[in-house]
């Protein structure tokens, strides 16, 4: 039976808070690397803890393909930008955040009105651009979870049907 050796040969955290690590596990027989890699990926994805915006309600919007007068991005682009927001939550309970911005403005995650249990990691994360006289108003759910969870179109946690569910970030 071979003695396996694992070694971290490179590790860093980028300015956008993404982390990178390169490890060597040896010696492995032919085909064992793929088997070990797949098992490791599954374990990591199912056990990583994360916080994300999981549902959104935007004032005056009834579907994700709509546009908002005076806002450069359409609703789908705004939703994709919201999915990129990196959040930390100190509560296991669902939290509600709000956003109300008058144009002209460049809307960022720093404009969010969040409960004290939730914080934005990068307050400069871009959401949308508003022209003069326009308004962007929304309410969104923030949830903490483990692993990856796909869209659940059935439930909005008490939100009305105009809510747009998002996939949870891991």
Give the positions of each predicted feature.
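Protein-protein interaction/assembly regions in multi-subunit complexes
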Residues: 1-170
């Amino acid at each position: 039976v071979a003695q396996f050796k694992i070694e971290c040969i490179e590790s860093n955290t980028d300015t956008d808070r993404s982390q990178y690590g390169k490890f060597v596990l040896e010696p492995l027989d032919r085909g064992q690397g793929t088997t070990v890699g797949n098992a490791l990926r599954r374990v990591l994805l199912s056990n990583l803890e994360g916080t994300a915006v999981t549902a959104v309600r935007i004032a005056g919007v009834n579907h994700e393909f709509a546009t908002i007068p005076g806002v450069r991005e359409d609703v789908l682009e705004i939703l994709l930008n919201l999915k990129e927001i990196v959040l930390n939550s100190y509560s296991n309970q669902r939290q509600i955040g709000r956003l109300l911005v008058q144009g002209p403005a460049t809307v960022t995650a720093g404009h969010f009105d969040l409960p004290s249990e939730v914080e934005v990691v990068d307050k400069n994360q871009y959401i949308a651009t508003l022209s003069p006289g326009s308004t962007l108003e929304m309410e969104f759910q923030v949830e903490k979870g483990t692993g990856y969870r796909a869209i659940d179109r059935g439930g909005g946690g008490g939100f009305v049907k105009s809510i747009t569910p998002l996939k949870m970030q891991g």
